[in-house]
A protein has these predicted regions:
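Membrane-proximal intracellular helices of multi-pass ion channels
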Residues: 1-323
Length: 323
């Protein structure tokens, strides 16, 4: 059983290693030497461990117990390897090695689980390749969980049932194909919205790409100050929405099955957003767009805020908590 678990874990580690190539390319282009060394080491560790596990172990279907072990191992080992750049660069100015390791592992776990907690006082000051890597960990963990969920559904009958829930009519047995299709769709979102933000006036395309990843995964919270125009905030609302809905909506939009895209769950979510927006607008008098922005932010667990939620009244806070 343990070999089957390790083989599946090896596949995830290989994906993480491949995704680390992007920040490496950014670092090479910008000549960020110190950060590059840590990123190269991280990439090699991910790929070496992944290929080793795949070479020594044969991947087979997992039962429920094995899948639980896989999830635990993935969210322990991936952040451990992913903590190398944080530890190497010591972005926290830690007083000793123990604190440096603890801070690095905490930051890495926060990224891979898309929790978004951070000890960094000014993440925008990080080297750009490091900033991209930090955002990519959210993509590894956030999208990687799709594969982990697929591991629960080990029989063909269960896989087809999951396929219907995801909006994939024929899932077959090609789990890797499904996994890459998820990456492809979210990759298109990231590229398109990065270009749109750049055309709308964002000056730094690399930081913009990092911001888009942070928004669609609902993890780290970068500064909203560079994205304060109305068109940009509308784009942020769209990003938060597509990042929070069921994958079936995104898949059907890409396959132009628009009639099937509006499922009962999506319609209910839209009604919650509309009702919440009207309620917040009535209570705060902040404007329709501002109310909509914060309702989508809270209901999608993104957590963006530019009105100062800690200072508003308790009734409005309670509504945001419910959302």
């Amino acid at each position: 059983m343990i070999k089957h678990i390790l083989a599946n874990l090896g596949f995830l580690l290989q994906i993480a290693g491949l995704l680390t190539v992007l920040p490496i390319l950014v670092g090479l282009y910008l000549n960020e030497t110190q950060t590059l060394a840590s990123l190269f080491l991280t990439c090699i560790c991910f790929l070496a461990c992944g290929f080793l596990l795949n070479a020594l172990c044969e991947r087979k279907d997992l039962d429920f117990k094995s899948s639980c072990v896989l999830i635990l191992l993935a969210f322990l080992l991936m952040p451990l390897i992913g903590a190398i750049p944080y530890f190497y660069n010591d972005s926290f100015n830690s007083p000793n090695l123990a604190d440096r390791f603890t801070n690095a592992y905490f930051e890495s776990v926060s990224g891979f689980t898309t929790t978004g907690f951070s000890f960094m006082l000014n993440s925008d000051a990080l080297p750009k390749s490091f900033l991209i890597y930090r955002s990519m960990t959210e993509l590894m963990g956030g999208v990687g969980i799709v594969f982990l969920l697929l591991a629960f559904f080990h029989s063909r009958k269960s896989l087809n049932g999951l396929g219907n829930a995801l909006g994939i009519e024929r899932i077959g047995g090609n789990l890797k194909g499904i996994f890459f299709s998820v990456f492809l769709i979210y990759g298109v979102y990231i590229v398109v919205f990065t270009i749109v933000f750049y055309l709308l006036g964002s000056q730094d395309i690399i930081k913009t790409g990092s911001f888009v990843i942070d928004t669609i995964t609902g993890g780290y919270q970068p500064s909203l100050e560079p994205y304060s125009s109305i068109p940009m905030r509308i784009c942020i609302i769209l990003l938060m929405f597509v990042g929070s809905v069921n994958f079936s909506l995104n898949l059907r939009l890409f396959t132009l099955k628009l009639k099937k895209a509006l499922s009962k769950e999506i319609l209910l979510y839209l009604l919650v957003i509309i009702f919440g927006t009207v309620l917040i607008l009535f209570l705060t008098r902040r404007g329709a767009l501002t109310s909509l922005f914060h309702v989508v932010s809270m209901s999608s667990s993104t957590g963006y805020d530019y009105i100062g939620i800690p200072a508003i009244d308790e009734t409005t806070k309670s509504i945001f908590i419910l959302l």
